[in-house]
Swiss-Prot record:
Belongs to the neurotoxin 19 (CSTX) family. 08 (U8-Lctx) subfamily. GO terms for cellular component: extracellular region. One of its GO terms (molecular function) is toxin activity. Residues 1-20 form the signal peptide. InterPro entries: Spider_toxin_CSTX_knottin. It comes from Lycosa singoriensis (Wolf spider). Contains 4 disulfide bonds. Expressed by the venom gland. The keyword Magnesium does not apply. Residues 21-26 form a propeptide. This is U8-lycotoxin-Ls1n. The keyword Disulfide bond applies. Keywords: Disulfide bond, Secreted, Signal, Toxin.
């Protein structure tokens, strides 16, 4: 009986540890994915860059994307 209780407790501890570890290892956001609400979730070789959206000179919002570090994006006409 004691062995069954001990085994149950050990299994419970292992399952709890696995669930906690899986929760901490959230998948990272790949390149060009929106990171507005999760700026720290971009993959390690990427950075969350923020861009303001403007209409008639007034800012109407922000967009954030996971982009390569050190790369400068320019608008093409």
């Amino acid at each position: 009986m004691k062995l069954m209780i001990f085994t149950g407790l050990v299994l419970f501890a292992i399952v709890s540890l696995i669930e906690a570890q899986a929760e901490n290892e959230k998948p990272c956001l790949p390149e060009y994915k929106v990171c507005t609400h999760a700026p720290g979730n971009c993959c390690s070789d990427l950075v969350c860059d923020r861009y303001g959206r403007y209409k008639s000179g007034a800012q109407i919002g922000r967009n954030c994307f996971c982009l390569q570090k050190g790369v400068i994006y320019k608008r093409e006409n």
